[in-house]
């Protein structure tokens, strides 16, 4: 016989994703596939997609945390593009990273030039 159906063999271990091995939520396998299909290089190492997935996950978590804070400040429970815009533009490093990015339906940061603000009079200063 061909040897199929024997009962003495070991059961195959449950498959474990590379994302779970790395402790990530982002899909390492999908990132690897996209790196291979994207013609970025002839070959892609095993560690490259893990590292890239970790970086993407970190940036996403950072933006979502700041956007969640912006939503909470506006007494909202759902993050909308406006909250993403406020989160990115109020953070110096994220603003530099995403400087050339336009967020649809994001609006603009509120900003009034100092010369347009009402002047403080002496009475207002003494009242304090």
Curated annotation (Swiss-Prot):
A cellular-component GO term for this protein: nucleosome
Keyword line: Acetylation, Antibiotic, Antimicrobial, Chromosome, DNA-binding, Fungicide, Hydroxylation, Isopeptide bond, Methylation, Nucleosome core, Nucleus, Phosphoprotein, Ubl conjugation
Free-text description of this protein's post-translational modifications in UniProt: Monoubiquitination of Lys-120 (H2AK119Ub) gives a specific tag for epigenetic transcriptional repression. Following DNA double-strand breaks (DSBs), it is ubiquitinated through 'Lys-63' linkage of ubiquitin moieties, leading to the recruitment of repair proteins to sites of DNA damage. H2AK119Ub and ionizing radiation-induced 'Lys-63'-linked ubiquitination are distinct events. Phosphorylation on Ser-2 is enhanced during mitosis. Phosphorylation on Ser-2 directly represses transcription.
CDD domains: HFD_H2A (cd00074)
Tissue expression as described in the entry: Expressed and secreted by skin epithelium.
Principal cellular location given in the protein's record: nucleus
N-acetylserine PTM positions: 2
Phosphoserine PTM positions: 2
Annotated protein name in UniProt: Histone H2A
Species whose genome carries this gene: Oncorhynchus mykiss (Rainbow trout)
């Amino acid at each position: 016989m061909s040897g199929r159906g024997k009962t003495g063999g070991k059961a195959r271990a449950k498959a474990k994703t590379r994302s779970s091995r790395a402790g990530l939520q982002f899909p390492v396998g999908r990132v690897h596939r996209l790196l291979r299909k994207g013609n970025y290089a002839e070959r892609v190492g095993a560690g490259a997609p893990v590292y890239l997935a970790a970086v993407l996950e970190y940036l996403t978590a950072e933006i979502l945390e700041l956007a969640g804070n912006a939503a909470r400040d506006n007494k909202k429970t759902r993050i909308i593009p406006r909250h993403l815009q406020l989160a990115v533009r109020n953070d110096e490093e994220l603003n530099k990273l995403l400087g050339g990015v336009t967020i649809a339906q994001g609006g603009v940061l509120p900003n009034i030039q100092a010369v347009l603000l009402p002047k403080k009079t002496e009475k207002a200063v003494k009242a304090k």
